[in-house]
Regions:
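Alpha-helical recognition segments enriched in aromatics with Gly/Pro capping
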Residues: 1-22
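Feature 926 captures the class I aminoacyl-tRNA synthetase adenylation module centered on the KMSKS loop
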Residues: 29-336
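Short, solvent-exposed helix-loop connector elements
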Residues: 22-30
Length: 336
């Protein structure tokens, strides 16, 4: 097994299934998946090193951090705290799952892709490099107990301040690197990108087919900052942001909690199918709202349930009411 997939992959797999009272079902496929995870980390490190070059000297975190920098720094800061807490409680499986999700999704699939914009244009590249080194270093240290060989190998290749990763300082939570506002703002942008990509995938539209994207939102300043992210990651030729638009003609409409997005795709889209999708989404939202309102109209629930739970239901009802209004408006735009 070690000869085929590597010791790190085997260790990671065994830790993944580690939970008190849990008999792990071992399989080659799980070890193979861990090997693929190690490859993902290795390729991410190679990407970072490619842009650092041979003479790079880590200057420390700069002050001119962009929103995406604050977002990833805040996320890895929280990760360090949570993984440390998990390890102290011997929750190895939970710690490994958090590391896997962060490295694969948050760092590789989001931050690195967004960082490419600055690295390739040159504007803000130095800041992006410094943040990449900082986050990658913390990742390696947190992952080292589970994958000691690959983390040591990468650690030796990037700027480092100790002879071995084994004697380097363990990452600690830093309150100055907690950026809750930037995290919330990035989530709004990422939700929009996910929604656009999902809709394009449903319609089998290839990335090469770019379209202008119109974003109707009350958070224009947030989406203005993220417009370049939308262009790159949601295959937009251009992004226009406003608190309202006139008649845009035939468009595909995408609704998130924070924005209403229009994509004029012309004859690439089956508008009858789009109308059916919106009607289905509207019916589901109306059913969910009716269920929540029934609970809120019940004095027994309102008086006996924890105040926090009642408020969560009220907030959800408000969001659904707004979503329903947006969906109905979208159907009107399609003439349905």
């Amino acid at each position: 097994m070690i000869d085929q997939y590597g010791a790190d992959a085997l260790r990671f797999t065994l830790a993944t299934g580690n939970a008190p009272g849990n008999d792990m079902r071992f399989s080659d496929e799980k070890v193979k998946a861990s090997r693929n995870f190690a490859n993902k980390l290795w390729n991410a490190a190679r990407f970072v090193l490619m842009y650092l070059g041979n003479d790079y000297s880590y200057p420390g975190l700069p002050k001119d951090l962009a929103i995406e920098d604050k977002w990833i720094l805040s996320k890895v800061n929280t990760l360090a705290k949570e993984v440390t807490d998990n390890l102290e409680r011997f929750e190895l499986g939970i710690a490994v799952a958090k590391l896997y999700d962060f490295i694969w999704d948050v760092f590789c699939d989001w931050y690195i892709e967004i960082a490419k914009i600055r690295l390739q244009s040159g504007e803000g590249a130095d800041t992006a490099k410094a943040v990449l080194v900082y986050v990658l270093t913390d990742i390696l240290k947190l992952l080292h107990p589970f994958m000691p060989f690959i983390t040591e190998e990468i650690y030796q290749a990037i700027p480092h301040d100790t002879e071995s990763i084994m004697i380097s300082k363990w990452p600690e939570y830093d309150p100055t690197l907690s950026f809750a506002d930037e995290e919330a703002q990035m989530e709004k942008i990422m939700d929009a990108i996910r929604a656009i990509r999902n809709r394009r995938a449903e319609m089998n539209i290839p990335p090469s087919k770019k379209s202008k994207v119109y974003v109707e939102t009350a958070f224009a300043d947030v989406f203005a900052v993220g417009s370049e992210f939308i262009k790159r990651l949601a295959y937009a030729s251009d992004v226009e942001i406003a608190d309202g638009f006139g008649d845009l003609g035939n468009t595909v409409t995408i609704v998130t909690n924070d924005a209403k997005i229009y994509i004029p795709l012309g004859d690439l889209v089956d508008f009858e199918a789009e109308a059916k999708r919106l009607q289905k989404e509207l019916a589901a939202a109306e059913d969910k709202l009716a269920f929540i309102n029934k609970k809120l109209d019940n004095p027994g629930f309102v008086n006996k349930a924890p105040e926090k739970v009642v408020q969560q239901n009220r907030d959800e009802a408000a969001k659904l009411t707004e979503k329903i209004a947006n969906l109905r408006s979208s159907l009107e735009n399609l003439g349905k």
